[in-house]
């Protein structure tokens, strides 16, 4: 019985690992596609913003206006595609956080313990620095009080 349960456990574990790998591959694909969309659309917006210095290309005013509205609409569509890709990246970030929270407790526990240790170390260093400054200020204050007392005493006697 225990051999069967162990086999089922290994099978479940490998299935979980395969599922995690598929999810991670999907995250990578989404990231790659959205970044590519942002880059391509930004490149095409910059390319469309270039002004054609050749006025001879337009025989009449209608040609200029047609190109202007075409370029304007193309830039608006590309800007909207960039917004959509950015929104998808935000969703991807939320999905990654959810995935990490649900599937990687060991990683989170390790990071929390590491952050706590770092915080305690920083607190200890700051406390030591505070104590050093406190003793230094106390010594300076004592020297000043002694100097004032000696000078004040010498003047009024």
Swiss-Prot record:
Q: How does it assemble?
A: Component of the Mediator complex.
Q: Name one GO cellular component term.
A: mediator complex
Species assigned in the record: Caenorhabditis elegans
Compartments reported by the entry: Nucleus
According to its UniProt entry, one GO biological process term is:
regulation of transcription by RNA polymerase II
Which named protein is this? Mediator of RNA polymerase II transcription subunit 22
Source taxon at top rank: Eukaryota
Annotated gene: mdt-22
Q: List, alphabetically, the InterPro entries matched.
A: Med22
Task: Name the family the entry cites.
Answer: Belongs to the Mediator complex subunit 22 family.
> Taxonomic lineage per UniProt?
Eukaryota, Metazoa, Ecdysozoa, Nematoda, Chromadorea
Q: Which PANTHER family match?
A: MEDIATOR OF RNA POLYMERASE II TRANSCRIPTION SUBUNIT 22
């Amino acid at each position: 019985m225990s051999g069967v349960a162990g086999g089922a456990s290994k099978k479940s574990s490998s299935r979980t690992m395969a599922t995690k790998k598929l999810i991670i591959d999907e995250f990578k694909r989404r990231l790659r596609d959205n970044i590519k969309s942002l880059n391509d659309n930004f490149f095409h917006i910059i390319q469309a913003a270039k002004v054609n210095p050749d006025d001879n290309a337009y025989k009449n005013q209608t040609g200029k206006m047609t190109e202007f509205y075409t370029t304007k609409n193309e830039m608006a569509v590309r800007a909207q595609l960039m917004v959509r890709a950015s929104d998808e990246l935000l969703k991807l970030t939320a999905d990654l956080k959810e995935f990490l929270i649900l599937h990687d407790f060991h990683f989170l526990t390790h990071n929390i313990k590491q952050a706590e240790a770092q915080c305690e170390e920083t607190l200890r260093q700051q406390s030591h620095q505070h104590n050093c400054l406190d003793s230094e200020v106390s010594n300076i204050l004592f020297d000043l009080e002694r100097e004032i007392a000696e000078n004040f005493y010498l003047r009024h006697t």
